[in-house]
């Protein structure tokens, strides 16, 4: 077996990484929202990528209960042509 020498010491991620990310939190829980409305397009656009995909909860920090409501609201808004299914193909 090959021996590659001493292992490098692990550095602490939070202190030395210049791209430290904030802790994720659920916007809907913090605002006290009970139900997500499909007509609130400004909120829905924050959770849709430029190419039309819904951003997953592990990236946004949204709780599972609200992520399901968000998914349904985005799909309803798409069906009613309030939101596009995909990006603009100019």
From Swiss-Prot:
Q: Keyword annotations for this protein? A: Ribonucleoprotein, Ribosomal protein, RNA-binding, rRNA-binding
State one molecular function term (GO).
Answer: structural constituent of ribosome
For this protein, the record's Pfam families field holds:
Ribosomal_S18 (PF01084)
Give the CC-aspect GO terms: cytosolic small ribosomal subunit
PROSITE patterns registered for this protein in UniProt: RIBOSOMAL_S18
**Any one Gene Ontology BP term:** translation
- Its function? Binds as a heterodimer with protein bS6 to the central domain of the 16S rRNA, where it helps stabilize the platform of the 30S subunit.
Q: How does it assemble?
A: Part of the 30S ribosomal subunit. Forms a tight heterodimer with protein bS6.
Which family, according to the similarity comment? Belongs to the bacterial ribosomal protein bS18 family.
What name does the UniProt record give this protein? Small ribosomal subunit protein bS18
Which species is the source of this protein?
Bordetella petrii (strain ATCC BAA-461 / DSM 12804 / CCUG 43448)
